Amino acid sequence: MALMILPFIGSVSVSESLVALTAVCLVYLILKFFRTEIPAGLRQLPGPKPLPIIGNVLEVGSKPHLSLTAMSKRYGDVFQIQIGMRPVVVLSGSETVRQALIKQGDEFSGRPDLYSFTFINDGKSLAFSTDQAGVCGACRKLAYSALRSFSTLDGTTPEYSCMLEEHICKEGECLINQLNTVMKADGSFDPFRHIVVSVANVICGMCFGRRYDHNDQDLLRLVNLSDEFGQVAGSGNPADFINILRFLPSTTMKKFMTINADFNTFVKKIVGEHYATFDKNNIRDITDSLIDHCEDRKLDENCNVQMSDEKIVGIVNDLFGAGFDTVSTALSWSVMYLVAYPDIQERLFQEIKDNVGLDRTPLLSDRSKVPYLEAFILELFRHSSFLPFTIPHCSAKDTSLNGYFIPKDTCVFINQWQINRDPELWKDPSSFNPDRFLSCNGTEVNKQEGEKVMVFGMGKRRCIGEVIARNEVYRGLAILIQRLQFHEMPGELLDMTPEYGLTMKHKRCHLRATMRARNEQ
């Protein structure tokens, strides 16, 4: 998941701005006389001086990952900005973020009570919930248990180590055939268009136990809903920062609510079908696994939290949304990097050919045989940093970090992009170099270096689907490299400039792909 509340410049109409200005001017004039009392021995947070009403939005601009990184060079790893009327603490630097999210995890594991969060999964989202213990904590335990159970389910044939691998492998074959067909018909393909549908099918298989044709209207509707969610959420919601705007008509907010309601309706229907056909002795997918783990509506004998059907819908919704957008964006960027660095693409192919072969698809058990591919994925995560921020955190109580006082209920941004491009952490961070993650002899991945990359957050709010996402990216990419060779279009320059949003995606483009011969030398 990524930061969904910056930037919002340009998303406020003139009428909204005028009403907000009138309504909050008095509030601002009153509040500016009140300053948070700093406990003895602690310092006040540094940061740029905010303007009335709008705060620091002009300085943040349309590329917050870059502007906030630049601010960290001036103010340090812990500083404060103001978005609208809301103070926001920005954390940068690997050690500072690790201190906050792991060593002081209980103090920074909250979520801010942003207005838009209440409409995601009807306010029952694991990822966006302000409840860090209680029901939310119980739901996270349930989700982890269900994911573990699903990931160990046997495939339908001995060829696959688990059902997850079977879903990824079969859909990978379908994607290869689809791209081959499109290339023969059109001579080029849009990588994001086809990858996103393929990934959606894998997630549908894992969550719902069903696969759709690539042109199926239900599947395309899901893809479009996810895309619309990213566009609307990525543009930000001013009502999250200027409270009076919550009570004013907003076409953007109305669309956001409709998107979430439509997706919830879709998931509720499928969960209802699963309840009607549930068989404890035949667990078909993650939804079945969730139902199995809470048939009695309790997680365990010592837990008094009742687990409703709505909570299961919320968990499935979260798993689908997070896994779908993250994996599809990662694989789409992967293809772009393969085209941008043809020598690296060829080296990856040779590694797979030499250590796995070309007569079968790469399996999860082959990962240790292809360390350069693993290093490529890590460098992809680091260099693209397509998840520039985690979902915003919130201080659960009055606390301090690096000697600075942070009041309770302060919104906290975690700048993953800065960590992944920090010159104090990485040699020549702007260059794309998978070898930085290999051991001296190049035969294995340097785990210590790999752990520096930040993409799924860390601590108590770390992405619950991280393991499945990493496996899916590895398997999907391995199949693509083994079977296809990717090229840029003749006469066209490849544009690797990311577009800021919920996740940072590359600009839509067309590429070429040719099938590799099974006996290729």
From Swiss-Prot:
Record-listed E.C. numbers: 1.14.14.1
Main location: endoplasmic reticulum
Ranges annotated as spanning the membrane: none
Residue sites binding heme per the record: 463
Gene name as annotated: cyp1a1
Species this chain originates from: Chaetodon capistratus (Four-eye butterflyfish)
Function: Cytochromes P450 are a group of heme-thiolate monooxygenases. They oxidize a variety of structurally unrelated compounds, including steroids, fatty acids, and xenobiotics.
Binding-site residues for substrate, renumbered to this chain: 229
Name of protein: Cytochrome P450 1A1
